[in-house]
Amino acid sequence: MSTTKAQIESAIKTALDYPSYMTLMQELVHKGMSTGLEQSDALTNYTLLNNKRMKRLNKTLSVSAQVQARIQNYPKDIRFLVLTESWCGDAAQSLPMVSKIAACQPNWSVSL
């Protein structure tokens, strides 16, 4: 099955920005839930762990001045459309850096 332009446009319209996703993660932790239809203790625990990891990485990661300069000179607009769930460990490790990279260029954004 291939993804159509209409599906991508729909996903972009309903997507969250990164700060909103972090707020959602916090709300899910508070409610003892995870994203998605399936709810389990394991997924709830992964959500809790990922929220902690992402908060830590948001505080400790940085983009070097050299990389920032290269990003700021990149002429094209970019939107990172990320498909994820709150319990996904890979996203917890990568989204904080993707967000920091996108923040270096006003014409770049992250949607989840």
Residue ranges, per PLM feature:
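Non-globular targeting/processing and membrane-anchoring segments
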Residues: 1-78, 100-104
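Thiol-based oxidoreductase modules, predominantly thioredoxin-like and allied folds used
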Residues: 80-84, 98, 106-112
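Conserved redox-active cysteine motifs that mediate thiol-disulfide chemistry
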Residues: 86-93
